[in-house]
Amino acid sequence: MTSGPQTILHVCSRDLIRQLRDRILASHGYSVVSTLSVTEAEDLYAKSHFDLVLVDVEGDGRIPQAEKLCSDIRHKDPEQKVAFVCNYRVSKISDCPNEIIRSEFNPDAMIEGVKELLG
């Protein structure tokens, strides 16, 4: 068990949204490491511990990329918590993620989803 704030790896291809979410998460006491790139997310994950990997799945081709990232992470650590952030239905075929947080334009819903998932 670690002391200090819980750490979130936030993956979002939309820079403005990424920055906004990072600020919202930080204002609620979370330590946030974020990236625009799935490839960079994999590198960051390999180097550090994260309590949650939060992946934005909005945009063309983002769901398959997010599912692959989730699968790769779970292969390395089956206990890692992963959540997708979206405002529409995501495929239920995948065993990833732990949670789908539907909160695209609602910061309170995003924080509530994160809190529920992290306990």
Residue ranges and their predicted role:
Residues R14-I17, V55-R62, R89-V90, P107:
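Short acidic, S/G/P-rich loop/turn micro-motifs used as interaction or catalytic elements
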Residues R14-V33:
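Two-component/phosphorelay signaling modules centered on CheY-like receiver
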